[in-house]
Each structure stands twice: as C-alpha cells, then as structure tokens.
Amino acid sequence: MHVISRKPFKDAAKKYPNDATAINQTYMVLRKGHFSSPAELRRLFPSLDNFKYKKKWWVIDIGGNNLRLLAFIEFRDNRMYVKHITTHAEYDKLCKKYMQAGD
C-alpha cells in the first residue's frame, strides 16, 4: 500500500515511545502490503473499522489497543493518508469534533 507519508508514524513514535515498536511495525506492514479491500486489510488488522464521521476514513488499533490510527484509505488505488495516530482519549475528542463538523 502506498502510505503517503511516514511522518505521522515518526511523530507518534516520539510522542508515544512505549508503543514505538508497534507503530513502526504497523507502518512496515502497511507499506509492504497490497490491500484492494477492507476485508484484505482486516486479515492483518482485525480491529479495522470504518470511521463513521468521514467517508473513506478507517480506524486501526495499534500497540495492543493502546493507540488508534485514523486514515483516509482509497482501496481502489491502494493508497493511505494517515490523519492521526493518537490515544483512545484523544480519539474520543476527535470523534466529537468530526461528528459536530459533519462530512
């Protein structure tokens, strides 16, 4: 999958050093894989779920469910743009923000 930028992963690894290994592993798995559908990606990331407040945004749990990765994924083109890698508490705040903003 074409992960548009590694920067969100590097930033998250610095911000959450206890989960840096899991963050970097997630990046490598995503970058090396080819996923033409959510079902294919879900085989490697069973936690994959759609983010109901934005079209084509998806959520993946990272680091034993310590963090959440929010990304725009275009399966047709096999590309991903990571929007956020954050804790569950911050994820809850983002949900409220996007829910209020609408699509």
Region annotations inferred by a language model:
Residues M1-N66, E74-Y81, H88-D103:
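Basic, Lys/Arg-enriched alpha-helical interface segments
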